[in-house]
Curated annotation (Swiss-Prot):
The keyword Disulfide bond does not apply. Forms a complex with MdtJ. This is Spermidine export protein MdtI. It is found in: Cell inner membrane. Belongs to the drug/metabolite transporter (DMT) superfamily. Small multidrug resistance (SMR) (TC 2.A.7.1) family. MdtI subfamily. It is a multi-pass membrane protein. Keywords: Cell inner membrane, Cell membrane, Membrane, Transmembrane, Transmembrane helix, Transport. Signal peptide: none annotated. Catalyzes the excretion of spermidine. It comes from Klebsiella pneumoniae subsp. pneumoniae (strain ATCC 700721 / MGH 78578). GO terms for molecular function: amino-acid betaine transmembrane transporter activity; antiporter activity; choline transmembrane transporter activity; spermidine transmembrane transporter activity.
């Protein structure tokens, strides 16, 4: 395991935020019918992967990718709830709990 440095965690946080932004823009694009949002979504994804590439210089790939994906999913669920009124059923909440547990286990491994 590599030695932790805050700059890599900052890059990971930027990657997570950009992934969430990309997902929200993708929803706003309405299947790319609203092209500006589709283009903004693609730009945010490019930025997210660029930031993730910087994060993995100091964070193990398995940990960085799991945290990026996990936090991205959890925050996108929250954004869907707040912005679009989307709600999870009980199975969805069970999935979120398993997701968070998996992220914790990967970080502790």
């Amino acid at each position: 395991m590599q030695q932790f440095e805050w700059i890599h965690a900052a890059w990971l946080a930027i990657a997570i935020v950009l992934e969430i932004i990309a997902n929200v823009f993708l929803k706003f694009s309405d299947g790319f019918r609203r092209k500006i949002y589709g283009i903004l979504s693609l730009a945010a994804v490019l930025g997210a992967f660029s930031a993730l590439s910087q994060a993995v210089k100091g964070i193990d790939l398995s940990v960085a990718y799991a945290l990026w994906g996990g936090f991205g999913i959890a925050a996108t669920i929250a954004a869907g709830w707040v912005l679009f009124g989307q709600r999870l059923n009980n199975k969805g909440w069970a999935g979120v709990i398993l997701l968070v547990a998996g992220m914790v286990l990967i970080k502790l491994a």
